[in-house]
Amino acid sequence: MTCNVAFIGLGVMGYPMAGYISKAGHNVTVFNRTKSKAEKWIGEYKGKMANTPAEAADGADFIFTCVGNDNDLKEVSLGENGLFNTAKKGCVYIDNSTVSAEISRELYKAAKDKGFDFLDAPISGGQAGAEGGILTVMVGGDEGTFKKAQPVIDCYSQKVKLIGPSGSGQLTKMMNQMCIAGTVQGLSEAINFGINAGLDMDKVMETISKGAAQSWQMENRYRTMTDDKFDYGFAVDWMRKDLAIVIEEAKLSLIHI
């Protein structure tokens, strides 16, 4: 079934994600703060461009956001030109951003009060996963809403799972980022050790990647790390932002980490 879809936020993740929804045959209207990105998108994919989040959301069956942080999400959602001003009753709002569980629960309640539904649905897989349409999506919200939205989420993902009630998607993403950060740090230390010990890193990685040390980061990042090339994948500043969310959530929940 063809649906009217709004997609707000055309960064390195959102741009191809919106593209996959368009290629699946849905009617997509995009908004991005930097207008040139939206103009580029409509030149590449079938769809329309809006001047505000509210304009993009007007008449949409499904509204997607993929923005940088809590403040950005509040602005495009609840701001003067935010999507809450025009979102129709019965629509589903799916947020793919990595933000706090607190703001997700706030938007869930605000959406209910307005007569529509909200899912927190952060993503994992990086730019390559977005461009390949093979992202992993961890979802928090109501089961009925999830079942309604899943066919559209499937357009850009290979694995979608409802974890639990509102906020559960973001809490799961926090765990995901903790695991990745620890793995990257360990891999970095190991590579530094191996290089300074005079080892052939190709032989080392070919060997240990077949054992218990194997990880996605080892398979996909060891060579660029060995070559001191770091303009790949997920930016350090974004990881720091995500880990700050983890620390704040742990404090609020009295969890020792």
Residue ranges, per PLM feature:
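NAD(P)+-binding Rossmann beta1-loop-alpha1 motif at the extreme N-terminus of oxidoreductases
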Residues: 1-65, 91, 96-97, 127
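Conserved small/polar residues in nucleotide/adenosyl-binding loops
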Residues: 255-257
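Active-site-lining helix/loop region of Rossmann-like oxidoreductase modules
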Residues: 161-165, 169-219, 223-253
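Rossmann-fold NAD(P) dinucleotide-binding segment
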Residues: 53-116
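Hydrophobic beta-strand scaffold residues
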Residues: 28, 49, 117-119, 160, ...
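Rossmann-fold dinucleotide-binding core
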Residues: 67, 99-177
